[in-house]
Amino acid sequence: MWPVLWTVVRTYAPYVTFPVAFVVGAVGYHLEWFIRGKDPQPVEEEKSILERREDRKLDEMLGKDHTQVVSLKDKLEFAPKAVLNRNRPEKN
């Protein structure tokens, strides 16, 4: 009798396994919900790194006077002279 029973179970395993797994999962889900109790209060979402960066950039921009800009001639002086004046003998 046992060999016949095992043959039937092996043949119909997909049809037996899903309902058993479904029942075990549902019982586990409800048991966990019962043990855990009420849901905790929602926590305020923290600002993302991108949002914090944008806020910081906006704060920095508010403190600056955008009418005062550095001229392009002054900006060129910060580059290494060896690179910019290599082929210009009048600047050496």
From Swiss-Prot:
What topology does the record note for this protein and the membrane?
Answer: Single-pass membrane protein
Its keywords, alphabetically, are: Membrane, Transmembrane, Transmembrane helix
Q: InterPro entries, alphabetically?
A: UPF0767 (IPR031933)
Q: Does the keyword DNA-binding apply?
A: no
Supply the PANTHER family for this chain: SMALL INTEGRAL MEMBRANE PROTEIN 12
Homology family? Belongs to the SMIM12 family.
Q: What is this protein called?
A: Small integral membrane protein 12
Task: Name the source organism.
Answer: Rattus norvegicus (Rat)
Gene responsible for this protein: Smim12
